[in-house]
Amino acid sequence: LRWVVGDMWKRVAYWVGLFAALLLLFACQKPLFMWYNALKPLAFKDYIEAMWHGMSLDATVAGYLTAIPLLLLLVSVWAKRFPLRKIMRPYWILVAIVLAIVFVVDTALYAFWGFKLDATVFNYLDSPSEAFASVSVGFIVAGVIIISLTATLFTYLLLWITPKRLDKVRHQIVGTFFLLLIGGGLFVFIRGRVT
């Protein structure tokens, strides 16, 4: 067991750290959303309760986002030197951009729309001018700048967590089985949260 843990530690630590970082990232977004859109001062416990209440959904999203990294960790077990960060870079850039857009748009437009982003937003895809009819050009420009900065910050964080490369595991079969167990647990976790 000692040599298995020793070989797999870097991979497991990365995945657990990544999952925790995404949870923390999502949790920190809630107080910012509440602070920006609050009509009256909120107590500290209100922020904590919101973060706790959203933890279940945040964990589900984090599970989906860490599924691809887990698959790559599985592949890395059989590679001599696996350039994980290089391979993950496009994925994390895309994820960071999407997360930044959702967070900033949701936070900024809640005061105009009166509801958080959901499937309703797709009703405006054919007529985006209606969606932003009550928003000034300056507001949109500021939003684009904030989205860019937020996406850059998210990208830096996700790439910083990701190891530059992973070395080959000495006992590939055991390592593969170990990661498959984690993957199975993740699948059950996601399915349980969704249903």
Task: Give residue spans per PLM region.
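Hydrophobic cores of alpha-helical transmembrane segments in multi-pass inner/ER membrane proteins
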Residues: 60-73, 143-159
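Alpha-helical transmembrane segments and their helix-start/interface "positive-inside/aromatic belt" motifs
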Residues: 7-20, 83-97, 173-177
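Membrane-helix interfacial "entry" motifs
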Residues: 3-15, 42, 46-50, 54, ...
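Cytoplasmic juxtamembrane interface segments
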Residues: 3-6, 67-93, 161, 166
